[in-house]
Amino acid sequence: VRGAEDYNYYLDEYVYAEELGFDGVALNEHHGNPFCMGSVMNVEASILARITKRVKIILIGNPLPVIKHPLRMAEELATIDLISRGRLVAGWVRGAGSEQFFNNANPAYNREMFEEAHDFIIQAWTRPGPWRYEGKHFHYRHVNPWTLPYQKPHPPTFIPGTLSPETIMW
């Protein structure tokens, strides 16, 4: 199967980049289109966290407005940071149109869902539990994450957006 060959080839290339002395390797994620095979970059990142030793693992980035569970995202990324012993750089994106259609997300709420998910994830990494969360788009009766990032207070985060002035200013 061609996909199996490609995924393993890409992972080998990331390992080779570390051997060549690169400081970081970047993974991208897109959904429902043919121009990016990386549809679950957190899985790839967790593999790289284990098979590399030094290189930063840079995620460009998780599409926060289309994820359904920011608590799960916080735990996944904290786990990657733990396995890598602090080499995760978490990037957040609002997601392109294809991500919204693919994930049944309403584009009218894109920005506010992005901001709410981002703020929730940072809280999940830094706020002692248990606590309750009642946001506009996400609701949790009981938040008590025990999987916390290796890096304190949390991994470096960034937003690689360039399309809207609001995102750049945010």
Predicted regions and their residues:
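Short, acidic/polar
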Residues: 5-16, 73-76, 162-170
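Flexible, glycine-rich active-site loops centered on histidine and acidic residues
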Residues: 1-3, 66-133
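Short, small-residue-enriched loops and turns at beta-alpha junctions
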Residues: 33-36, 64-68
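Extended catalytic-interface subdomain
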Residues: 113-125, 140-143, 160, 170
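Hydrophobic/aromatic ligand-binding patch that stacks against planar heteroaromatic rings
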Residues: 47-48, 79-82, 170
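N-terminal beta1-alpha1-beta2 module of alpha/beta enzyme domains
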Residues: 1-59, 152-155
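N-terminal small/glycine-rich loop or linker at the start of catalytic domains
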Residues: 1-2, 97, 139-154
